[in-house]
Amino acid sequence: MTTDEVKALIVHAIPDAVVTVRDTTGSGDHFSAEVASAQFAGKTLIAQHLLVMDAVKEAMAGSHAPLHAFDVRTKAI
């Protein structure tokens, strides 16, 4: 999986998101994302993270999932 593919999953689910994704190991399966969105306003940090995790959950499903580890940081804009 590429950083662009991870970003596309997030932007598809949260269209106004400003997203930065890093491949943390260079292996294409461990990523870190910073996501800012107006949709996060008034939501708890956990609720914000759940919105992002929902966007990538299919890529993390199963033992051979292309996305193995995912670290997320969020903020409202």
Locate predicted features.
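A generic short-segment signal for beta-strand/edge and adjacent turn/coil regions
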Residues: M1-E5, A38-K43
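Charged, low-complexity, helix/coiled-coil-prone segments
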Residues: M1-T3, G28-H30, A69
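N-proximal, solvent-exposed amphipathic alpha-helical segments enriched in charged/polar residues
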Residues: M1-V18
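Short edge beta-strands and adjacent turn/loop segments
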Residues: D16-S32
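C-terminal structural segments of small proteins and small subunits
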Residues: A41, I46-I77
